[in-house]
Amino acid sequence: MSYSTFKRSLEIEVISAEGLKVDRKPLKKKTYSVVRIDEKSWASKVDELGGSYPIWKDRFDMEMPINASVRFISIEVYYRTSGSGRDKNVGYAKIPVTDFMGGFAPQGHLNFLSYRLRDEYGDKCGIVNVSIMVKPDGNDHKSSLPSSSFAVAPVDYAACSWQATAAARNNQMWRPRTSSSMVSTAGYGGGRVVTGVPVWCAYQRPS
């Protein structure tokens, strides 16, 4: 039995976050994100502009066991502190492996997803936008894919907030320009979506 049978290669991009809050107040600090699988972790660059709507667009290649030991991928967001020298946690989200593996998500399929962030008390503190692709293994159709397979991979935007979706389609970075553009994030879909579930209908999509 091959090594690829036990593990799958993933390509995860932590794109951005929206409406970050600390103690229910909009965050103004510089932030970064951390992806965790099992005992391994990968950190993004720091968003130097700071604020509640950071953009990272950092992509990581990683391997994930496909046995029952890993059921979730964790995304954590931290902000830089000026005095203590220790970064503080804003919130985290857990992404079920079943959201991007098996079922109707074949290997090589690029999934754009948005997840609720919650702080240590379980309160909602923002949304994180990610893309996840399970790379085809050597026994599948990997050899037939062009070197730029990321660019031509099938794409599903169904669970991504519409602002990030529009930016991704045009290969652009998205950040709200005025306070009026932040109004729609206040309720995050009426609070009916919880950590670990994609934010399917949190935003009204443009007509």
From Swiss-Prot:
InterPro entries linked to this entry: C2_dom, C2_domain_sf, C2_SRC2/BAP
Location(s), subcellular: Membrane
Biological process per Gene Ontology, one example term: defense response
Pfam families: C2
Induction entry: Down-regulated by high temperature. Up-regulated by salicylic acid, AgNO(3), chitin, cycloheximide, ozone, syringolin, salt stress and upon pathogen or nematode infection.
Entry GO CC: membrane
Keywords of this entry: Membrane, Plant defense
Gene3D superfamilies documented for this protein: C2 domain
Tissue: Expressed in roots, leaves, stems and flowers.
Domain C2: 1-112
Topological type in the membrane: Peripheral membrane protein
Disruption phenotype: No visible phenotype, but accelerated hypersensitive response (HR). Bap1 and bap2 double mutant is seedling lethal.
Main location: membrane
The protein's assembly and partners: Interacts with BON1, BON2 and BON3.
Remaining remarks: Overexpression of BAP2 can suppress defects in bap1 mutants.
Protein function: Negative regulator of cell death and defense responses. Exhibits calcium-dependent phospholipid binding properties.
Name of protein: BON1-associated protein 2
Species in which this protein is naturally found: Arabidopsis thaliana
Lineage: Eukaryota, Viridiplantae, Streptophyta, Embryophyta, Tracheophyta
Name of encoding gene: BAP2
